[in-house]
Amino acid sequence: MTPTHMNITLAFTISLLGMLIYRSHLMASLLCLEGMMMSLFIMTAVMASNAHSPLINIMPIIMLVFAACEAAVGLALLVSISNTYGLDHINNLSLLQC
């Protein structure tokens, strides 16, 4: 395993660990989730550049689009919860059920 792959894997693992530790606050969870997506994006971009195939080069861009959509939905939910309840605790999500 090259040092680049090891660093990217370590970044993903640290983000996953942060997600498990700070799971009670939505903002911290969103930041950790974004760190996981960025490390996956970099890993996919490195793998695509090593593959030398033009069909694989579109995969990191697609992953980046999904990460942006996920961040937008998460931030919209965060704003909605913080405006309604004044807190960003994840246990407030159960109060949003219809």
Swiss-Prot record:
Subcellular location: Mitochondrion inner membrane
GO terms assigned for molecular function: NADH dehydrogenase (ubiquinone) activity
EC number(s) per entry: 7.1.1.2
Transmembrane region(s): 1-21, 26-46, 61-81
Gene Ontology CC, one term: mitochondrial inner membrane
Membrane topology of this protein: Multi-pass membrane protein
GO biological process: ATP synthesis coupled electron transport
Catalytic activity: a ubiquinone + NADH + 5 H(+)(in) = a ubiquinol + NAD(+) + 4 H(+)(out)
Record keywords: Electron transport, Membrane, Mitochondrion, Mitochondrion inner membrane, NAD, Respiratory chain, Translocase, Transmembrane, Transmembrane helix, Transport, Ubiquinone
InterPro entries: NADH_UbQ_OxRdtase_chain4L/K, NUOK/Mnh_C1-like
Cited Gene3D superfamilies: 1.10.287.3510
S-S bonds: none
Enzyme class: translocase
UniProt keyword annotation of Cell membrane present: no
Main location: mitochondrion
Protein family per UniProt: Belongs to the complex I subunit 4L family.
Function: Core subunit of the mitochondrial membrane respiratory chain NADH dehydrogenase (Complex I) which catalyzes electron transfer from NADH through the respiratory chain, using ubiquinone as an electron acceptor. Part of the enzyme membrane arm which is embedded in the lipid bilayer and involved in proton translocation.
Subunit structure: Core subunit of respiratory chain NADH dehydrogenase (Complex I) which is composed of 45 different subunits.
Protein name: NADH-ubiquinone oxidoreductase chain 4L
The organism's taxonomic lineage, starting at the top: Eukaryota, Metazoa, Chordata, Craniata, Vertebrata
